């Protein structure tokens, strides 16, 4: 039965008129330029974000390590996205008048399949690592600050295993039969692909709720510490917790929004499949790589959030200096208060 299905898919080598028209259209060429621009901008901001994380202690060491690894993963994913677009445009130019040569056989795309979906899943499950990082920092604060790198590495290993498991469920043993317009399309016989996407959506929604709760707890805790504690270390730790939790909330919401816009758009097109031509479906679908947009938002959010937090710190320091004068005056005032 599978062999018959494979043979049937392999026999559909030629692109339909609508699909061939879409693949050779100006819209797809513009899409290649647009996505490539998105990728190149994400490269620049990934480098700036990594530098910002490396040189500043805005986030805890555990969160910084997780974010740096996620940024490196995003670079690999973006490179794969751009490569699939460029090879598609190249083939559409070379075989513009040959609809039976313009499509890619799924077996030709095996390497892209591994890189694209593994990095895609790893990127999605970063929300899992970041959420648990925040939970541990709140509920096991002392342990967290003593073992930050161990916690980060453990969460990253778990994140990688989740990505591998998702890839295994979706594509293990799936015959690479049939033809696809681009190499980032999943094989036509991968029946569990949509199930994995649904699971990822549930994971992201759950992480948004949990991280929002962790942020609420960290804000509440910081207010209490500011009232009751005069320890600079404890007060700064609480402030760092709030800043990190807020940033993680923003990152997860951005990731979810980008992915959901893509999923909603594709699902809407599928629902309207009878009313929408194959040509229109292909053209619009090419502009909906949600993870590619998420991988642009990630470094942008990290970079600008870091800069904003540094600026806020400087303002706080300036306020303190204006209130207490220079350091010498402040020390003298403290000594005087201690004498009484």
Curated annotation (Swiss-Prot):
<comment type="similarity">
    <text>Belongs to the nematode receptor-like protein sra family.</text>
</comment>
<keyword id="KW-0812">Transmembrane</keyword>
<dbReference type="Pfam" id="PF02117">
    <property type="entry name" value="7TM_GPCR_Sra"/>
</dbReference>
<dbReference type="GO" id="GO:0007606">
    <property type="term" value="P:sensory perception of chemical stimulus"/>
</dbReference>
<feature type="transmembrane region" description="Helical">
    <location>
        <begin position="150"/>
        <end position="170"/>
    </location>
</feature>
<feature type="transmembrane region" description="Helical">
    <location>
        <begin position="34"/>
        <end position="54"/>
    </location>
</feature>
<keyword id="KW-0472">Membrane</keyword>
<feature type="transmembrane region" description="Helical">
    <location>
        <begin position="114"/>
        <end position="136"/>
    </location>
</feature>
<dbReference type="GO" id="GO:0016020">
    <property type="term" value="C:membrane"/>
</dbReference>
<keyword id="KW-1133">Transmembrane helix</keyword>
<dbReference type="InterPro" id="IPR000344">
    <property type="entry name" value="7TM_GPCR_serpentine_rcpt_Sra"/>
</dbReference>
<feature type="transmembrane region" description="Helical">
    <location>
        <begin position="250"/>
        <end position="270"/>
    </location>
</feature>
<feature type="transmembrane region" description="Helical">
    <location>
        <begin position="199"/>
        <end position="219"/>
    </location>
</feature>
<protein>
    <recommendedName>
        <fullName>Serpentine receptor class alpha-23</fullName>
    </recommendedName>
</protein>
<feature type="transmembrane region" description="Helical">
    <location>
        <begin position="284"/>
        <end position="304"/>
    </location>
</feature>
<dbReference type="GO" id="GO:0004930">
    <property type="term" value="F:G protein-coupled receptor activity"/>
</dbReference>
